[in-house]
Regions:
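Thiol/disulfide oxidoreductase modules built on the thioredoxin-like
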Residues: 112-119, 126-174
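Active-site acidic short loop of glycosyltransferases
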Residues: 60-62, 92, 119-120, 137
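Hydrophobic beta-strand core positions in alpha/beta domains
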Residues: 65-67, 99-101, 145
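Conserved hydrophobic/aromatic "anchor" residues
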Residues: 43, 59, 68-69, 113, ...
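Short pre-active-site segment immediately N-terminal to redox-active cysteine/selenocysteine motifs
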Residues: 62-64, 68-72, 139
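Structural microenvironment flanking redox-active thiols in thiol-disulfide oxidoreductases
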Residues: 77-117, 127-134, 169
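N-terminal targeting signals for export/organelle localization
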Residues: 1-42, 165, 180
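A short beta-strand-turn-helix
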Residues: 43-64, 87
């Protein structure tokens, strides 16, 4: 192969690489990663007890523990009592536990499950899993602690002991902080 031909191939390869990279960056979907420190995405879901639509905006000014779960999820079942204890201990105008079921079942099935477990905090139903998608959840249970300003402060993948000292201290601190 001649020297000129080698240079032509090398320059062509570099140009193809640069053009391909630029094209990939341009056509790549722009996805904002949901992470600690970012604004919590707005959501809409139905309250299983009242049937009324609920949005994250309705909780503005409160600290929210948003929990994504399903009735068929064993770790979710294990986690629910600690969410209930935390809600009873700290639930007020300044803090709310909001549990969103992604079950395919009817609202009545999810509501019956919540009654069976004695849950008194807000239970929403999102059978389309739009909230799971908006929050880029990988499974259930998955939870986010959102401050009064709508910013994600903590994310937990998997079950947690929500009424344990570390989690409770975080929630208390956030409730005591004024909104900005």
């Amino acid at each position: 192969m001649t020297h000129a031909r080698e240079w032509t191939i090398a320059v062509g390869s570099v140009m193809a690489l640069v053009f391909g990279t630029a094209l990939a960056v341009k056509i790549r979907p722009q996805i904002d990663l949901i992470r600690v420190g970012s604004r919590a995405p707005e959501f809409h879901a139905g309250d299983v007890r009242t049937g009324r639509p609920v949005t994250l905006e309705q909780y503005r000014g409160r600290v929210v523990l948003l929990n994504l779960w399903a009735t068929w999820c064993q770790p979710c079942r294990v986690e629910m009592p600690s969410l209930e204890r935390l809600s009873r201990r700290l639930g007020s105008d300044g803090f709310r536990v909001v549990a969103v079921s992604i079950d395919d079942d009817a609202d009545s099935v999810v509501a019956a499950y919540a009654r069976q477990l004695g849950l008194t905090f807000d239970i929403l139903h999102d059978p389309s899993a739009a909230i799971k998608q908006a929050y880029q959840a990988t499974g259930v249970p998955e939870s986010w602690v959102i401050n009064r300003d709508g910013v994600i402060i903590k994310k937990v993948i998997g079950a947690s002991e929500w009424d344990g000292p570390v989690n409770e201290a975080l929630i208390r601190r956030l409730v005591d902080e004024p909104a900005r």
